[in-house]
Amino acid sequence: MQGSVSNKISKAAAKIKNEFSQKLSVKDVARECDMSESSLYHNFKIVTSLSPIAFQKKIRLEEAKNLLATKKIGVAQAAFDVGYESASQFSREYARMFGMPPKVHSEILRSGVAS
């Protein structure tokens, strides 16, 4: 992969990481990185093995896991804090990624049994 394309993908990944709780517009990210949407999708997947949307989702869920482990907040609050508009959608995606519902996982994380 050419250096300039690699730099553009790094820039896109950094933008998504920094703004993970915001609504993601791949079109806007592509424009800011001076790429077409299709080129961004294609090259982003080569570099990260995820689409830009899946990358954002992974970051959101990891951040939610950290919030649930370290703060005394409920699942719905964690969902909204990381950018989800629906607590039920958040719970489904969280369980899919971590293998258990966020409420159960947060209790385990807070008790120090799992990391």
Ranges and model annotations:
Residues 1-14, 18-22, 110-115:
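Inter-domain helical "communication" segments and dimerization helices
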Residues 11, 15-17, 23-59, 79-104:
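Basic/polar phosphate-binding segments, predominantly the helix-turn-helix DNA-binding elements
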Residues 20-21, 68-70:
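Short amphipathic helical patch at the helix-1/turn junction of helix-turn-helix
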Residues 48, 71, 76:
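Ser/Thr-centric signal marking residues that sit
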Residues 56-65, 104-115:
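Short, basic, alpha-helical segments at the C-terminal edge of helix-turn-helix-like DNA-binding modules
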Residues 77, 81, 112-115:
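Intrinsically disordered, low-complexity basic tails/linkers immediately adjacent to helix-turn-helix/homeobox/MYB/SANT
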